[in-house]
């Protein structure tokens, strides 16, 4: 099998969707991998699954579903979260500069796939990619409190918000001045047009 980048290992090369509990990475007899949804669609009219790349056939016994094909262990190794403990804390950096910890239970029998736990917390059908960070025990927050570094950075964040507001006010004032200047030029030209038949120059 050809060497793929780590990004391409995370997604099905047919539909380009990331692997998830609904789209498990299934290994064919020819050692190619694609998601269970694509394999199910390819199998709708056939008893066997034909590989879309090498045309190799993976025979499925009667009553055997695509879900029963083995998962690709290489792909699971790339997308699996390390089993440090029963509950590995996950820190998610949000656009609002907040950092929240989600304790995710990890089953040792199966790997945690993207979208398995964290994405269920999002409203609607939104999906966000999150980066799982292993945090040393000495840097973990105590009893759900914020880490010490986050507490120290809080005054800096307020300063950034104040400077951002101030720069916005300055931008509005600058735009208003430019508009007044342009309005002055237009009014001056209009007064010159009304006096064009006189001898006085509007220079």
UniProtKB/Swiss-Prot annotation:
What EC number is given for this enzyme? Answer: 2.3.2.27
- Top EC category: transferase
Gene Ontology molecular functions: small GTPase binding; ubiquitin protein ligase activity; ubiquitin-protein transferase activity; zinc ion binding
The pathway to which it is assigned is: Protein modification; protein ubiquitination
GO CC term (a single one): lysosomal membrane
Give me the ranges of the annotated region Necessary for interaction with RRAGA.
Answer: 106-165
Q: What the entry says about post-translational processing?
A: Ubiquitinated. Autoubiquitinated in vitro, leading to its degradation by the proteasome.
How does this protein lie in the membrane?
A: Single-pass membrane protein
One Pfam family in the UniProt entry: zf-RING_5
| Keyword Transmembrane helix included in the entry's annotation | yes
Write the record's keywords in alphabetical order, separated by commas.
Apoptosis, Lysosome, Membrane, Metal-binding, Transferase, Transmembrane, Transmembrane helix, Ubl conjugation, Ubl conjugation pathway, Zinc, Zinc-finger
- State its role: E3 ubiquitin-protein ligase that acts as a negative regulator of mTORC1 signaling by mediating ubiquitination of RagA/RRAGA and RHEB. Catalyzes 'Lys-63'-linked polyubiquitination of RagA/RRAGA in response to amino acid starvation, thereby regulating mTORC1 signaling. Also mediates monoubiquitination of RHEB, promoting its association with the TSC-TBC complex and subsequent inhibition. Also mediates 'Lys-48'-linked polyubiquitination of target proteins and their subsequent targeting to the proteasome for degradation. Induces apoptosis when overexpressed.
Assembly, per entry? Interacts with RRAGA (inactive GDP-bound form); stimulated by amino acid starvation.
- Protein family membership: Belongs to the RNF152 family.
Q: What name goes with this protein?
A: E3 ubiquitin-protein ligase RNF152
| Biological source species | Ailuropoda melanoleuca (Giant panda)
């Amino acid at each position: 099998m050809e060497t793929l980048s780590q990004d391409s290992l995370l997604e099905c090369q047919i539909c380009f969707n990331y692997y998830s509990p609904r789209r498990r990475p299934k290994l064919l007899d020819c050692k190619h991998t694609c998601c269970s949804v694509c394999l199910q669609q390819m199998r709708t009219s056939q008893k066997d699954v034909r590989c879309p790349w090498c045309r190799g056939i993976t025979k499925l016994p009667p009553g055997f579903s695509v879900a029963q094909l083995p998962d690709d262990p290489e792909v699971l190794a790339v997308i699996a979260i390390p089993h440090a403990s029963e509950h590995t804390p996950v820190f998610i950096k949000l656009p609002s500069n907040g950092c929240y910890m989600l304790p995710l239970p990890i089953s040792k029998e199966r790997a945690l796939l993207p979208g398995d736990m964290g994405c269920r917390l999002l409203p609607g059908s939104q999906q966000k990619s999150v980066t799982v960070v292993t945090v040393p025990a000495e840097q973990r927050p105590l009893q759900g409190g914020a880490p010490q570094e986050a507490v120290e950075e809080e005054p800096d964040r307020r300063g950034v918000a104040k400077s951002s507001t101030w720069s916005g006010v300055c931008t509005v004032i600058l735009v208003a001045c430019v508009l007044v200047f342009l309005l002055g030029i237009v009014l001056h030209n209009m007064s010159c047009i009304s006096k064009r038949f006189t001898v006085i120059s509007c220079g």
